[in-house]
Curated annotation (Swiss-Prot):
It comes from Salmonella typhimurium (strain LT2 / SGSC1412 / ATCC 700720). Required for disulfide bond formation in some periplasmic proteins such as PhoA or OmpA. Acts by oxidizing the DsbA protein. Gene3D superfamilies: DsbB-like. Keywords: Cell inner membrane, Cell membrane, Chaperone, Disulfide bond, Electron transport, Membrane, Oxidoreductase, Redox-active center, Transmembrane, Transmembrane helix, Transport. The lineage of its organism: Bacteria, Pseudomonadati, Pseudomonadota, Gammaproteobacteria, Enterobacterales. The gene is dsbB. This is Disulfide bond formation protein B. It comes from the Bacteria. GO terms for cellular component: plasma membrane. GO terms for biological process: protein folding. InterPro entries: DiS_bond_form_DsbB/BdbC, Disulphide_bond_form_DsbB, DsbB, DsbB-like_sf. Residues 1-14, 66-71, 164-176 are cytoplasmic. It is a multi-pass membrane protein. Residues 32-49, 90-144 are periplasmic. Its main location: membrane.
Amino acid sequence: MLRFLNQCSRGRGAWLLMAFTALALEMVALWFQHVMLLKPCVLCIYERCALFGVMGAGLVGAIAPKTPLRYVAMVIWIYSAWRGLQLAYEHTMIQLHPSPFMTCDFMARFPDWLPLGKWLPQVFVASGDCAERQWSFLTLEMPQWLLGIFAAYLVVAIAVVIAQAFKPKKRDLFGR
């Protein structure tokens, strides 16, 4: 299996699949926001940014998957999945154990050189409360689903990094 993961990491298909899954999750988030009229909170916006990081890692890995650039993509992937996992956990704890002392910010804070809230306010402006439970599916709230999604991204990323030590088998058609 590790050889297979190594082989997949050297092809564009797996990287593009990862970018596509993150894009699909972003589209679902925008559907919830603009069609179902759910208000995203600050942690939702940060989790959305972590998903953009996973998508960016997929695109970076797809550029040149047979070169060392894929290691840069793996670092971005692991960092984004880890930060997303942390944010989803914090968001889940705020929802499961609401407290007036543990709240999220009123607006998302982005660096001055990357004012996403000004560039794309439809995507990056928060208007909801982190403790409010707006949506659930199969008894899980949205941050709990994101906890599982980011955990899956992180587990697969770690497996792919470990798989880099196992060289893929060379396919020899005639067995020489």
